[in-house]
């Protein structure tokens, strides 16, 4: 669900209360939280860490996905099962976050860019590269149906 949520918001295929239908959610949003040497956080439609997409969903925290290196991408939340649109990227291992946040990605290239991001820097656009046949036919709304999203 977590990956499908991020892809759906990035591509504009998941309905939300912050953007018009079909509009890419993350384009133009800012990074509202930066903890030097630790994490950067973005994805808030209000730009201050208090916004959401109008729904929340459950945590997915398998023990195999950890905050064990720089570049881990995970959902930010305000408590268990309150995931929405906000995400963060780690700049170093932070094992204290394990089990409480849904890890769903890893930055593979450009880790140095993360360290240059400052509060207020904009996300110009998010591009999802669908490589391979299974990625090309992946249906976000089947993987993350509306019933899995609890309206706020």
Where in the sequence are the language-model features?
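Cyclophilin-like peptidyl-prolyl cis-trans isomerases
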Residues: 1-152
């Amino acid at each position: 669900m977590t990956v499908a949520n991020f892809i759906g918001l990035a591509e504009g295929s998941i309905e939300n209360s912050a953007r018009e239908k079909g509009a890419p959610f993350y384009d133009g949003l800012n990074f509202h939280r930066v903890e030097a040497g630790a994490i950067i956080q973005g994805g808030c439609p209000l730009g201050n860490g208090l916004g959401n997409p109008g729904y929340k969903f459950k945590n997915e925290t398998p023990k195999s996905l950890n905050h064990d290196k720089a570049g881990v991408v995970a959902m930010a939340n305000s408590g268990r099962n309150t995931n929405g649109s906000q995400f963060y990227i780690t700049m170093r291992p932070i094992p204290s976050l394990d089990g409480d946040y849904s890890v769903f990605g890893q930055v593979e290239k450009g880790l140095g860019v993360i360290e240059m991001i400052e509060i207020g820097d904009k996300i110009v656009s998010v591009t999802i590269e669908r490589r391979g046949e299974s990625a090309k036919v992946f249906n976000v709304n089947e993987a993350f149906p509306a019933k899995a999203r609890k309206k706020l």
